[in-house]
């Protein structure tokens, strides 16, 4: 597959889509060169909703469906419709459920309420997700004091996916891009009770990721974005700012989003004690 391919990933669930989204993002960590358009379809519980989804899928694109559904009839209907359009349709939990069932020699429960998790914790997560999306890439910093975590880093260091992953865990996150020779647009010196984390990465890996990004955007003429000396200055500036302010730095070179987030959560928990 060409590195410039864009995948339309459709996440479908009869519940909140949190499980299928988590599995999908873990899997996609192994394909960082692929540009992904993510479509989330939650609380799907009848054939008409599936028909609507299938009608909205662009036929001339690379499409991929991942889903969690506990109703056997609905699951079969989705697979039938996806098969008719020759779209891969992968159940993310079926194999695990089947293995547990076989091992224990019992059948799975025929029905699971889709209201599971719709409690205060669920709505806290929704609030965190909304806040984090609104504050992606340095946007809307006027209420940055409402954040739990602030992430800094140069372009393409996994700031946004890490922020969203943390939001799914209930943390309100702001991520701010660091651009060489441009001062931060907000004063973070008075954020003493906030966890501020810097993300860094191996320069060769960063340039590779950026080159792939430029190819996918058909913007190969942006030479400065992948110029070794310029990128090196960006990375050094990030480290300088973080060291100067006593903020922890995480090297994301060999880390998945889950690993980055887990490290950030550890720092956050230490601050609370």
From Swiss-Prot:
Q: What catalytic reaction does the record list?
A: N(tele)-phospho-L-histidyl/L-threonyl-[pyruvate, phosphate dikinase] + ADP = N(tele)-phospho-L-histidyl/O-phospho-L-threonyl-[pyruvate, phosphate dikinase] + AMP + H(+); N(tele)-phospho-L-histidyl/O-phospho-L-threonyl-[pyruvate, phosphate dikinase] + phosphate + H(+) = N(tele)-phospho-L-histidyl/L-threonyl-[pyruvate, phosphate dikinase] + diphosphate
Q: Under which name does UniProt file this protein?
A: Putative pyruvate, phosphate dikinase regulatory protein
What organism is this sequence from?
Ehrlichia chaffeensis (strain ATCC CRL-10679 / Arkansas)
Question: Which keywords does this chain's UniProt record carry?
Answer: Kinase, Nucleotide-binding, Serine/threonine-protein kinase, Transferase
Q: What does this protein do?
A: Bifunctional serine/threonine kinase and phosphorylase involved in the regulation of the pyruvate, phosphate dikinase (PPDK) by catalyzing its phosphorylation/dephosphorylation.
Q: Which residue spans adopt a coiled-coil conformation according to this UniProt entry?
A: none
Q: Which HAMAP family match?
A: PDRP (MF_00921)
Q: What is the lineage of its organism?
A: Bacteria, Pseudomonadati, Pseudomonadota, Alphaproteobacteria, Rickettsiales
* GO molecular function terms attached to this record: ADP binding; ATP binding; phosphotransferase activity, phosphate group as acceptor; protein serine/threonine kinase activity
Q: What is its EC number?
A: 2.7.11.32, 2.7.4.27
Protein residues bound to ADP: 153-160
Q: What class of enzyme is it?
A: transferase
Similarity comment: family membership: Belongs to the pyruvate, phosphate/water dikinase regulatory protein family. PDRP subfamily.
Quote any Pfam family the record assigns.
Kinase-PPPase
